[in-house]
């Protein structure tokens, strides 16, 4: 059969904010900005969407580990990198936003997150993983949305009530609550809390154990375990993004008055 998917040798060199390394079928995905902690930009937003697609299409990937660089996973955002002046700009954001989380869910092998530090921008991304490990320094907060007057409609509204339960999830989003690693563990958003030194070795230990399982067991386990989240995401993501866009446009108009 002709192989049409982009080979690892190509897509592993494709992204400026994502470092990709593979050993024994375990793919390590490290997000960064110039080798330091990831700054959330329009480029990082779009790159992750397309990188997740490349990963999903590569059947040589047996398990995926997702982690960050430096003291934080993603604790800073560059708002100036986003062009949000016209309906066409927002249409592009909605287009890419749908692909970001849907492409992550389209990966048909188990995904392990190793959250190396605070994450205030898109904290839903790591907690969508099948196994979530957190460093003791990790914190989780949805910073750029409701605390800033924006609807948390880009998938946060789907993921956090799913992970924390309806009441805790809504409270988390509406109050800007920051969860430390131990609280996230108690709430079920995190599976293990480890020291910074133990974090990646533990992720690799789990990944290698999963990689030894039969191919179809690995792939189909991922599919059945994410089915409910995929179904809700498909139903609610686009509407949430549209509402987020309207609220953001309204906020921008108010600030200009």
Swiss-Prot record:
UniProt keyword annotation of Transport present: no
pH dependence as annotated: Optimum pH is 7.
Keywords: Hydrolase
Listed SUPFAM superfamilies: ClpP/crotonase
Coiled-coil intervals: none
Catalytic activity: bornane-2,6-dione + H2O = [(1S)-4-hydroxy-2,2,3-trimethylcyclopent-3-enyl]acetate + H(+)
Active site feature: 124 (nucleophile)
Mutation effect (residue 154 to N): 100-fold decrease in the binding affinity
Top-rank lineage group of the source organism: Bacteria
EC number: 3.7.1.18
Keyword Hydrolase part of the UniProt annotation: yes
GO molecular function (one): hydrolase activity, acting on acid carbon-carbon bonds, in ketonic substances
Regulation acting on activity, per entry: Inhibited by copper and mercury ions. Also inhibited by thiol active reagents, such as N-ethylmaleimide and hydroxymercuribenzoate. EDTA has a slight activating effect.
EC supergroup of this enzyme: hydrolase
Binding site for substrate: 40, 145, 154, 244
Assembly information from the UniProt record: Hexamer. Dimer of trimers.
Family: Belongs to the enoyl-CoA hydratase/isomerase family.
Record's function text: Catalyzes the carbon-carbon bond cleavage of the bicyclic beta-diketone 6-oxocamphor via a retro-Claisen reaction to yield the optically active (2R,4S)-beta-campholinic acid. It is also able to cleave 2,2-disubstituted cyclohexa-1,3-diones such as 2-methyl-2-propylcyclohexa-1,3-dione and 2-methyl-2-butylcyclohexa-1,3-dione which result in racemic keto acid products. Transformations of the bicyclic diketone substrates bicyclo[2.2.1]heptane 2,6-dione and bicyclo[2.2.2]octane-2,6-dione yield (S)-keto acid products.
Protein name: 6-oxocamphor hydrolase
């Amino acid at each position: 059969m002709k192989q049409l998917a982009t080979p690892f040798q190509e897509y592993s060199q494709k992204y400026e904010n994502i470092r990709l390394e593979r050993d024994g079928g375990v793919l390590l995905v490290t997000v960064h900005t110039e080798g330091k902690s990831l700054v959330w930009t329009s480029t990082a937003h779009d790159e992750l969407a397309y990188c997740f697609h490349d990963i999903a299409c590569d059947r040589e990937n047996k398990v995926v580990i997702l982690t960050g660089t430096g003291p934080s996973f993603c604790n800073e955002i560059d708002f100036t990198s986003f062009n949000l002046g016209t309906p066409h700009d927002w249409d592009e954001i909605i287009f890419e936003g749908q692909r970001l989380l849907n492409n992550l869910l389209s990966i048909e092998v188990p995904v392990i997150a190793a959250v190396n530090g605070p994450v205030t921008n898109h904290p839903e991304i790591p907690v969508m993983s099948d196994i979530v490990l957190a460093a003791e320094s990790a914190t989780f907060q949805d910073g750029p949305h409701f605390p800033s007057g924006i609807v948390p409609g880009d998938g946060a509204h789907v993921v956090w009530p799913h992970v924390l339960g309806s009441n805790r999830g809504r409270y988390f989003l509406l109050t800007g609550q920051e969860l430390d690693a131990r609280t996230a563990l108690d709430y079920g958003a995190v599976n293990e809390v480890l020291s910074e030194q133990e974090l990646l070795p533990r992720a690799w230990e789990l990944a290698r154990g999963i990689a030894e399982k039969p191919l179809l067991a690995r792939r189909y386990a991922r599919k059945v375990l994410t089915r409910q989240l995929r179904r809700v995401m498909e139903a609610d993501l686009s509407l949430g993004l549209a509402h987020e866009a309207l609220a953001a446009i309204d906020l921008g108009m108010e600030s200009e008055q």
